[in-house]
């Protein structure tokens, strides 16, 4: 079957933003204008197409990033038809994993900002993730119709807070309730959308006289940014010659693709203004799969490999999300980087080294799906019923195996014990948690060996609430959850040398004998977390027992001597020991190593580390004193505040253990007018009194 849309006309984009910037509404409008959905879904009615899990519609926030395909030929039908694959990503920090994962498979992103709130804390996290994966982006300043809307302030914040070179493509005509349309700075025309048909049609008009001077100035700024793409254009610009519309767009595109410029559009998705022009900007400035460098990977023999975005290369794709669908079971979302695959074909999972058969392939439109027969380079689709595929696995042609880069997933910071309400649900709960952990790598499940309880861990209270909620809805398992537990860590502060561990049982028959001498030393928290250095000379311990020593120590790291928390940031140097020809074994050396480690750890000034969160509170000025007072009681280190007339932003670092229930307390202190966000920042040494209490509690 021939390709219906040439790959140069594909745009794989993510829409990402802070929680209330109106991102899902923007996605809904995209589906409406591109003709996919015939009735606009409103988030505040709980009818949005992209938010299809029940909890999302109740809470009005986006949890799983739905992938949708849409087609667009421009506001004035000025382009051949382009295919836009939109991935709607969550804006809540507890779901950062979803954002990280979708950034990995996107080619470009639209960053949505609220014209009132501007660049908010989560925007910074998302921006850093986009930088990490070198994703070219444009910005859309939404909610221009809201009281306090200020377009140019947001343009400035993108520069100062995010370090992005923001260049407006448009200026708003009016603001707040007087917002009527935008001026297209390249064409120097005002665009007015028709309210009667929900903005489906529009007219170009002259720029309002009172805005001419300002528009000229910003147009000059835009043309200069474009001209910097090449010497030739710079000369033309400085000679005072006009650049054509075509030259401006081509040059800007070049600078967006290299990450040098962020074009900024504005509008009000809710009022049906501006989204159409933003879609044009997606086509004008964001990359096709062929505009970005070939994806890199590792060939079967360990050498570096790559795949170009072409149908002629061997098939390669990355599974970036596993979702459970009530009707068809497992859905594996994947992005095709190269080649072609048909439903019914067998592919190779190079990470798990297993074959998988692509039974049915579907293209998702939010939660509606169309079955398709084949997918090609650049496509995003979902496969039904793959047996053993995890997030981040590579699915590729059997005859040309490659492992595309794995994604890195954050370590959970909070844990709670969960138990089913009835004994009968025990097995169902295990099954449900296993399924949910497969979907979400930032969520972990394990059984506490001492208490036998099931412990679930995740990225925050909201994350775990939603997991428990999904168990109830999707798997019909009612569960009780315990008090949240913080994931502490243990480490050492000083170096100790020449600590020995000896395991010897030699009373008749085959004995056991292992003897090691180690040094233990602290490592930089930014480093690898653990290192093992073998400096045995002259065969005092035979080579085959060295891995057993390393293993013996690594097993101790899982549950530290202080309070049973994971041990981090230390190194071990094995430099002496002895063995017995008959009685030595791997097990004996493993036990000797663990004895040496425990003895050394106790002498090396062990400390407890607690997770510190980066907290940002936004509050009306009247409550600043109360908020800071309360943060101080929570052992916060307040790093500063920024204020404008409506809101004060307070930045602080606070131990996670002090943040439980903060949402409720903050609400009551500020009559519900303040909001906050937090994300894991680092681990730091817990004060002696706190550490003592934690260690004591673990002994009970």
Curated annotation (Swiss-Prot):
Database matches in SUPFAM superfamilies: EF-G C-terminal domain-like, P-loop containing nucleoside triphosphate hydrolases, Ribosomal protein S5 domain 2-like, Translation proteins
One Gene Ontology term from the biological process aspect of the record: ribosome disassembly
GO cellular component, one term: cytoplasm
Keyword annotations of the record: Cytoplasm, Elongation factor, GTP-binding, Nucleotide-binding, Protein biosynthesis
Residue span, tr-type G domain: 8-290
UniProt xrefs under PROSITE patterns: G_TR_1, G_TR_2
Gene Ontology molecular function terms on file: GTP binding; GTPase activity; guanosine tetraphosphate binding; translation elongation factor activity
Stored Gene3D superfamilies: 3.30.230.10, 3.30.70.240, Elongation Factor G (Translational Gtpase), domain 3, P-loop containing nucleotide triphosphate hydrolases, Translation factors
Superkingdom of origin: Bacteria
Residues annotated for GTP binding in this entry: 17-24, 88-92, 142-145
Compartments where located: Cytoplasm
Classification via NCBIfam families: EF-G (TIGR00484), PRK12740.1-5 (NF009381), small_GTP (TIGR00231)
Entry similarity comment: Belongs to the TRAFAC class translation factor GTPase superfamily. Classic translation factor GTPase family. EF-G/EF-2 subfamily.
Function: Catalyzes the GTP-dependent ribosomal translocation step during translation elongation. During this step, the ribosome changes from the pre-translocational (PRE) to the post-translocational (POST) state as the newly formed A-site-bound peptidyl-tRNA and P-site-bound deacylated tRNA move to the P and E sites, respectively. Catalyzes the coordinated movement of the two tRNA molecules, the mRNA and conformational changes in the ribosome.
Protein name, per record: Elongation factor G
């Amino acid at each position: 079957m021939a390709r219906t849309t040439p790959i140069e006309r594909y745009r794989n984009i993510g829409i990402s933003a802070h929680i209330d910037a109106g991102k899902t509404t923007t996605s809904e409008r995209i589906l409406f204008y591109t003709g996919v959905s015939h009735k606009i879904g409103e988030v505040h009615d709980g009818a949005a197409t992209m938010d299809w899990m029940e909890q999302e519609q109740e809470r009005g926030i986006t949890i799983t990033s739905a992938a949708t395909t849409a087609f667009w030929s421009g506001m004035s039908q000025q382009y051949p038809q382009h295919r836009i694959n939109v991935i709607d990503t969550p804006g809540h920090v507890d779901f950062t994993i979803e954002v990280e994962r979708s950034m990995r498979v996107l080619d470009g992103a639209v960053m949505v900002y609220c014209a009132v709130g501007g660049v908010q804390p989560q925007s910074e996290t998302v921006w850093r993730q986009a930088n990490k994966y070198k994703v070219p982006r444009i910005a859309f300043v939404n909610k221009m119709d809201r009281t306090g809307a200020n377009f140019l302030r947001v343009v400035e914040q993108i520069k100062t807070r995010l370090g992005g070179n923001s260049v407006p493509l448009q200026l708003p005509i009016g603001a707040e309730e007087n917002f009527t349309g935008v001026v297209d700075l390249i064409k120097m025309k005002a665009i007015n959308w028709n309210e009667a048909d929900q903005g489906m049609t529009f007219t170009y008009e002259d720029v309002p006289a009172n805005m001419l001077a300002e528009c000229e100035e910003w147009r000059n700024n835009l043309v200069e940014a474009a001209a910097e793409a090449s010497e030739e254009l710079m000369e033309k610009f400085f000679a005072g010659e006009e650049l054509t519309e075509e030259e401006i767009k081509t040059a800007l595109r070049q600078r967006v693709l290299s990450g040098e410029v962020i074009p900024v559009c504005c509008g009000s998705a809710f009022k049906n203004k501006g989204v159409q022009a933003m879609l044009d900007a997606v086509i004008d400035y964001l990359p096709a799969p062929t505009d970005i460098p070939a994806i890199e990977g590792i060939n079967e023999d360990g050498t570096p490999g790559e795949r170009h975005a072409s149908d002629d290369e061997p098939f390669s794709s990355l599974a970036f999300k596993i979702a459970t669908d009530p009707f068809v079971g497992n859905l594996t979302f994947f992005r095709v980087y190269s080649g072609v695959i048909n439903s019914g074909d067998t592919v190779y999972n190079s990470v798990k080294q297993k074959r998988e058969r692509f039974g049915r392939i579907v293209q998702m439109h939010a939660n509606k799906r169309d079955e398709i027969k084949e997918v090609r380079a650049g496509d995003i689709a979902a496969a039904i019923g793959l047996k053993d595929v995890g997030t981040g696995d590579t699915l590729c042609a059997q005859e040309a195996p490659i492992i595309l880069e794995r994604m890195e997933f954050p370590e959970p910071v909070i844990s709670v014990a969960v138990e089913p309400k009835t004994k009968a649900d025990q097995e169902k709960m295990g099954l449900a948690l296993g399924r949910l952990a497969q979907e979400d790598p930032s969520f972990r499940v394990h059984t506490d060996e001492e208490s036998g309880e099931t412990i679930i861990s995740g990225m925050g209270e909201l994350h775990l609430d939603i997991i428990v909620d999904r168990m109830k809805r999707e798997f019909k398992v009612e569960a009780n959850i315990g008090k949240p537990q913080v994931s502490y860590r243990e480490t050492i502060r000083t170096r100790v040398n020449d600590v020995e561990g000896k395991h010897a049982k030699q009373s008749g028959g085959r004995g056991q004998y292992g003897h090691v001498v180690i040094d233990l030393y602290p490592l930089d928290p930014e480093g690898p977390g653990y290192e093992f250095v073998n400096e045995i000379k002259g065969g005092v311990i035979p080579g085959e027992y060295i891995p057993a020593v390393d293993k013996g120590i690594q097993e101790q790291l899982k549950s530290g001597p202080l309070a049973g928390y994971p041990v981090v940031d230390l190194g071990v140097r094995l430099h002496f020991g002895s063995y017995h020809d008959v009685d030595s074994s791997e097990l004996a050396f493993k036990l000797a190593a663990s004895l040496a480690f425990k003895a050394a750890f106790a002498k090396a000034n062990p400390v407890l580390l607690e997770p510190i969160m980066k907290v940002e509170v936004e509050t009306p000025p009247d409550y600043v004193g109360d908020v800071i007072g309360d943060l101080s009681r929570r052992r916060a280190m307040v790093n500063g505040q920024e204020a404008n007339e409506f809101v004060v932003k307070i930045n602080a670092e606070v131990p996670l253990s002090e943040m439980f229930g903060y949402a409720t307390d903050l609400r009551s202190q500020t009559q519900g007018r303040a909001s906050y966000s937090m994300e894991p920042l680092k681990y730091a040494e817990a004060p002696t009194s706190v550490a003592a209490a934690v260690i004591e509690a673990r002994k009970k």
